[in-house]
Amino acid sequence: DLRQRLVDTVRDPWMAWEDAKHLVDGRRALFDEHMEHLRGKRRDLLAKLFAKHAQDALQTGGDVILPLVRADPAYIESALPRFVGDTHQGQQHTTLEAEFDAWDQWRHAQARREFQDMLRENAFVDFWGRLQKRDKGEADTVEADDEDDEGTMVSLLDMASQLDIQAMESVLKMDKRYKVFAHVPEQRTAWVRAYLQSLSVP
C-alpha cells in the first residue's frame, strides 16, 4: 500500500519530492497530501505550545512567548526544532517566528468571532438593544403589578432609553470572551456599540 509506505518511511515534513517519488511510483498528489498532513501535525503541536505560554492573554507577543516555547521541554524533545529550522538548516520553509505570526493572527480572529458570538447569545443585550431602537412614539407598555403602590404603567421604552453602553457592558464583564480584550477597552466598547446599532427593531 503506497499510503502506508509513506507513513512508515517519510517523516520529514520538508522532504523534497525528488527524494520520495520512487516510494510512491510518481504519484505526486499522494505525496503532497502526506506532506500537508505531517506539517499540520507539527503546527497543531506548535499551536498548543503557543497557547500554553500565551495563557489566554491576547496582548502577549512573540517577544515573550517564543523564548518560553524554545525553553519548553515539550518543544526541545520533539521534532519541532527541526521543523522550524532551529536545529537543522535544511530545506525547511518556515521559522518559529513565522509560525507564531500565523497563529497570532488566527487567535485574534478567533477571539473576535467569539466576542460576536457572545453578543448574539446574550439575551439581555439582545432584548434591550432591540428595544432601544424602537420608535419612541410607540405605545409599547406593560402594566405594573397590581400590588404596586403606585399602580403605574411601566414603559419598556422608557426603561430601555435609560440603559447606556456601560449598562450593557456591566452584564458582559464576567464573560471570558469579553475580558480577553481588556487591553483594548475603547475598541471593545466600539464593537458593542456597533453591534447594538446593527440590531433590527423588534
Predicted segments, located by residue:
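Structural signature for extended repeat/solenoid scaffolds and their inter-repeat hinge/linker regions
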Residues: 1-202
